[in-house]
Curated annotation (Swiss-Prot):
Name assigned to this protein: 3-isopropylmalate dehydratase large subunit 2
Annotated catalysed reactions: (2R,3S)-3-isopropylmalate = (2S)-2-isopropylmalate
Single annotated GO MF: 4 iron, 4 sulfur cluster binding
Origin organism lineage: Archaea, Methanobacteriati, Methanobacteriota, Methanomada group, Methanopyri
Gene3D superfamilies, A to Z: Aconitase, domain 3 (3.30.499.10)
NCBIfam families: hacA_fam, IPMI_arch, PRK00402.1
Superkingdom as given in the UniProt entry: Archaea
GO BP annotation list: L-leucine biosynthetic process
InterPro entries from the UniProt entry: Acnase/IPM_dHydase_lsu_aba_1/3 (IPR015931), Acoase/IPM_deHydtase_lsu_aba (IPR001030), Aconitase_4Fe-4S_BS (IPR018136), Aconitase_4Fe-4S_dom (IPR036008), HAcnase/IPMdehydase_lsu_prok (IPR011826), Homoacnase/IPMdehydase_lsu (IPR006251), IPM_dehydratase_rel_enz (IPR050067), IPMI_cat (IPR033941)
Residue runs in coiled coils: none
Length: 402
């Protein structure tokens, strides 16, 4: 039986396709944010053309620089808004949250849909059983112009997870463990397909898994729907990797590689100056709730640690506020930033200085990712981040939490 990716793309192309073939595909969704959108618009101008083939498919989301971090950022966004008006692009989301969160929340990404997005973490939509691919802004200019792009039909690497996670291990620890075992380029131009335990996980946890698939080189990621048609169930896979969830422990990606993954106990005692909770990886309501509860349990943050919490979307912020989490965090001295990418890309709202050591719930820890190239970033779960925020250093949650 063909893989899920082969079946979905065959339906789009109108004839059977196999992994390795190069085909032109018309997606259901063409997503741009304020970064890739600006690049796409500049490319169209350089080509001397300005046309949008399928405006009804275009989704424009401002998330990288919200609110605008500079005059240049404000001008880029204003130009994109004017472009959207000229071409009758109606799906415009300004200051509503991270693009990948909004795509899922607003139902743009859904079972069997094909999403082309101008961001490398577009595979996050695979959590909603969409087949989602990330492209650069230049490629996305041609998606606007022609309503299609060529792709190579990806092979399928299945990660089958048996058993259950044992607290305090989380989906983030599972995701980092997979990246650590596979390595940064292992799944190059593959669909990383999760089966077993991930099929029973919450949507937020599935988004975390699919989001980090990019860091193993995956072109796309996919979790089968809990209930759905047979054509969206797993088929053939080029490779199957099996993991036991009960063996997963709290881990961190140490500077400066996402795939350099180690148990938290191996780096115990590293002093921390910053903690960032948010991003398209771990900025959802449950992430913030768990972080807040643990921070309260451990009597609040260490006095030498500065904390920024960035909700992944306006809906997340609303729910945080309704549940009383926002006020609790503020009273503990935590900075709450507007929904969006925040300091994840090192542009504003909490960038790191030369000597900062940050525990981040995001997805990348390259030199300069969050500010100074001399800063160090440890990627971790909200649980590990909360313990570090309270202790002022990296501590294995298994040693602290009952």
């Amino acid at each position: 039986m063909p893989s899920v990716a082969e079946r979905i793309l065959s339906e789009k192309v109108g004839e059977p396709v196999e992994a390795g073939e190069t085909v032109y595909v018309e997606p259901d969704v063409i997503m741009l944010h304020d970064g890739s959108g600006a690049t796409a618009l500049r490319t169209l101008r350089e080509l001397g053309v300005e046309r949008v083939e399928s405006p009804e498919k275009v989704v424009l989301i401002f998330d990288h620089s919200v609110p605008p971090s500079s005059v240049e950022a404000a001008n880029r966004q204003n130009e994109l808004l004017e472009f959207a008006r000229r071409h009758r692009i109606e799906h415009v989301h300004v200051d509503e949250g991270v693009c990948h969160q909004v795509l899922v929340e607003e139902g743009y990404a859904g079972p069997g849909r094909v999403v082309f997005g101008g961001d490398s973490h577009t595979p996050t939509s695979g959590a909603a059983s969409a087949l989602a691919f990330g492209f650069g802004g230049t490629d996305m200019a041609f998606a606007l112009l022609y309503g299609e792009l060529w792709i190579r039909v990806p092979r399928t690497v299945r990660v089958h997870v048996e058993g259950e996670l044992e607290e305090p291990a989380t989906a983030k620890d599972l995701a980092l463990t997979v990246v650590g075992e596979l390595g940064a380029g292992y799944a190059d131009y593959a669909v990383l397909e999760y089966t077993g335990l991930p099929e029973r996980m919450s949507l937020g946890d599935r988004m975390c898994l699919c989001n980090l698939a990019t860091e193993a080189g995956a072109k796309s990621a996919y979790v089968p729907p809990k209930e759905g048609p047979e054509e969206l169930r797993p088929g053939d896979a080029d490779e199957v990797i099996e993991l036991d969830a009960s063996e997963v422990e709290p881990v961190v990606s140490v500077p400066h590689r996402v795939d350099d993954v180690r148990p938290v106990g191996d780096v115990q005692g590293v002093e921390v100056t910053r903690v960032f909770v948010g991003s398209c990886t771990n900025g959802r309501y449950r992430d913030v709730r768990v972080f807040t509860e643990i921070l309260e349990e451990l009597d609040g943050p260490h006095p030498d640690v500065r904390i920024v919490v960035v909700p992944a979307s306006r809906r997340v912020l609303e729910r945080m506020t309704e549940a009383g989490l926002t006020l609790k965090l503020i009273r503990m001295g935590v900075m709450i930033a507007p929904p969006g990418c925040g300091p994840c890309l090192g542009e504003h709202l909490g960038v790191l200085g030369d000597d900062d050591v940050c525990v981040s719930t995001a997805n990348r820890n390259f030199p300069g990712r969050m500010g100074s190239r001399r800063a160090e970033i440890y990627l971790a779960s909200p649980v590990t981040a909360a313990v570090a925020a309270a202790e002022g250093e990296l501590v294995d949650p298994q040693d602290v939490l009952g």
